[in-house]
């Protein structure tokens, strides 16, 4: 049974690629056609590749894997934080700090600083410090929390990265490659898929598309950890959508209506 139906992907706008002038030719195998200057992603392939990604992530979770969700663009920030947290995993949803993976020991010193300031705030230390010093410490805490809060409790370098828009997150991709950490990613029509281990061809700019696929990766982790099916209702939804739109139907719907396109 497919993890997501073509209808669900269509409703989330997963099929909208970038403008044809902004494409990476290596994504050609995942493109169905072009309409009104926009590439239409082949959702039949996306359905299967989401299944592959889901199974990969679930298996890694069953083996006790640590996952890092990465998405710093505005459209991804909320979904990345919420879904990683729901799955009991870790995230970076603001600027990726160079060396987050390749200089993990240094990053840990900054995380320790964050924890120390938090402790000072709760153990009464702030009450005996000058107001100016407390103000500076709070500013430092806010900055550290913004960039490191999502990995504050990450026990080690992650076993898998899930990335929304690897083109934007190229430093994270490069660091993962150096450390041989597999990458699962939402890959749009303007991105080089060769950098990614487990590809999900998808619109990576629409909030609903990002939320839908990110939530499925979180579901895979939860299912892998629990050793049971995540959502029977989801399977029923996919079954009900089985006779949903073909790619031809989707292209017809797109004709003259690119409101969701970039």
From Swiss-Prot:
Signal peptide: none annotated. Pfam families: Ribosomal_S2 (PF00318). Gene3D superfamilies: Glucose-6-phosphate isomerase like protein, domain 1, Helix hairpin bin. The keyword Signal does not apply. GO terms for cellular component: cytosolic small ribosomal subunit. Residues 224-246 are annotated as: Disordered. The keyword Signal does not apply. Keywords: Ribonucleoprotein, Ribosomal protein. Coiled coil: none annotated. InterPro entries: Ribosomal_uS2, Ribosomal_uS2_bac/mit/plastid, Ribosomal_uS2_CS, Ribosomal_uS2_flav_dom_sf. CDD domains: RPS2. One of its GO terms (molecular function) is structural constituent of ribosome. GO terms for biological process: translation. It comes from the Bacteria. Belongs to the universal ribosomal protein uS2 family. This is Small ribosomal subunit protein uS2. It comes from Lacticaseibacillus paracasei (strain ATCC 334 / BCRC 17002 / CCUG 31169 / CIP 107868 / KCTC 3260 / NRRL B-441) (Lactobacillus paracasei). The lineage of its organism: Bacteria, Bacillati, Bacillota, Bacilli, Lactobacillales.
